[in-house]
């Protein structure tokens, strides 16, 4: 189901709690909402649709990647950049890493570890910031 986008920083700044298999529908809602906003958005976190759970989706080269409880376990190549966010107005500066390795649960809630680089890594870092209540 396509959900409305939360645009209130006070709601976005609250850290999210771990997702469970009972939150699978939220993951599907994120996928649906990302597809509906594909012309203006490359990633979403659950708090952006009003759910304080650690769930993100990122538009990657092979298709949308859905992650439950993502954690960055390795990072290298810090750089400064600017980002926008569907939930916020304007562009803001932030620090990111060129390469990251993420531990997460996949759509079946099976544990996974995967490395990302470049823009895909940036999208995922932005989503994980949302999970941690960090607003760029």
Regions found by a protein language model. Give the residues of each.
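Positively charged
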Residues: 1-136
